[in-house]
Amino acid sequence: LSVHLWTPDYFSFRTTRDQALRFVNGQFVTIGLEVEGRPRMRAYSIASANYEEHLEFFSIKVPNGPLTSLLQHLKPGDKLLVSKKPTGTLVLRDLKPGKRLFLFATGTGLAPFMSLIHDPETYERFEKVILIHGVRWTNELAYHDYIEQDLKEHEYLGDEIRDKLIYYPTVTR
């Protein structure tokens, strides 16, 4: 279990993945923590790809939020509850065919798209994948360096990503 603070408000966190958990890239699960003996659960899109051994989530801290204010301070050894039933229709099989796939996200809405841009099928089905990520401030462009640099060097998808993924980080202030 680890937490990455992108800004004081934006953070991502990773946890080990139960090998029995199967999901389709773009889906979400319900996650949470036990608080005062009861589970406190919320739906979160999965940011990691379905072939990775960990689960990654991207969140914003909601002031006095019943769950996000706790998730931001997770430490190794803390127990994160993860539902066994992923769901959601933001998946490739539900998209109409076409030459270009446009992915528009603001803030933490980037999470399911992170999963999709790691999916080999995305690049098989579309000639171009255009990812637009809008935020208020430059420092809120979480994953920017990863998308611009590291992802293009992906061991298996690097060539496809360099050729087909177009990334437009957008800042409004």
Label for each model-derived stretch:
Residues 1-78:
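Ferredoxin-reductase
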Residues 66-173:
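FNR/FR-type flavoprotein reductase catalytic core
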